[in-house]
Amino acid sequence: MSVGGEFKAMRKPIHWNHPVWVILVLHVSLLVLIASRTTPNVDEVAHLPAGISYWKFGDFQLYSVNPPLVRFVAAAPVLVAEPEFDWEATISGPESRPEWEVAQRYIAATGSRSLWYFRFARWACLVFPAIGGFFSWK
C-alpha cells in the first residue's frame, strides 16, 4: 500500500450532522450576540488603535507588552471602514505606554462610530474560538 493510500485511510470524514457542529454554531452565534450588545472593556479600547497602528505604520510600540496577533486580526475590518484619526505624537519613547492616551483620542475622534468599529473588531476575532472549537473536536 502506498503512503498516500495510508494517509487517505487515516483521514476521518467530516459529518455535518454531528452534534458538535450544532454546538460550535450555537457557540459562535452566542459570541456574535454578546459582541454586538456589550460595550468595549478597558483593554479593548487600547487594543484596537494599537492594531490599526500596526497595519498602517508597521510599528509595534503601541501596546507592546503582549503579542500582536489578536490586535492584527481585530483591526483588519476596521481598516476597511477607514476611520479618521490623527496619529501625531503617539509614541514618545522606548519605555512609554502611550496606548491609553491614543485610545482616548481615538474614541473622541471616531465618536459614536467607535462602537461599530469595536463590533467589527470583535466579529473578526470570532475566528479564534471557531478554530479552537473545531480542533478541540478533532
Predicted segment positions?
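Membrane-interacting alpha-helical segments
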Residues: 4, 52-55, 74-77, 81
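Transmembrane-helix motifs of polytopic, lipid-linked glycan transferases
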Residues: 123-138
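Membrane-water interface of alpha-helical transmembrane segments
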Residues: 10-20, 115-125
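Extracytoplasmic catalytic/substrate-binding loops of multi-pass membrane glycan-assembly enzymes
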Residues: 37-49, 60-73
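Extracytoplasmic catalytic-loop and juxtamembrane helix elements of membrane-embedded
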Residues: 42-53, 88-98
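Interfacial juxtamembrane loops and adjacent helix segments
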Residues: 61-124
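Short, Lys/Arg-rich, polar N-terminal cytosolic tail immediately upstream
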Residues: 1-13
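Transmembrane signal-anchor helices characteristic of membrane glycosylation enzymes that use polyprenol
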Residues: 16-44, 56-59
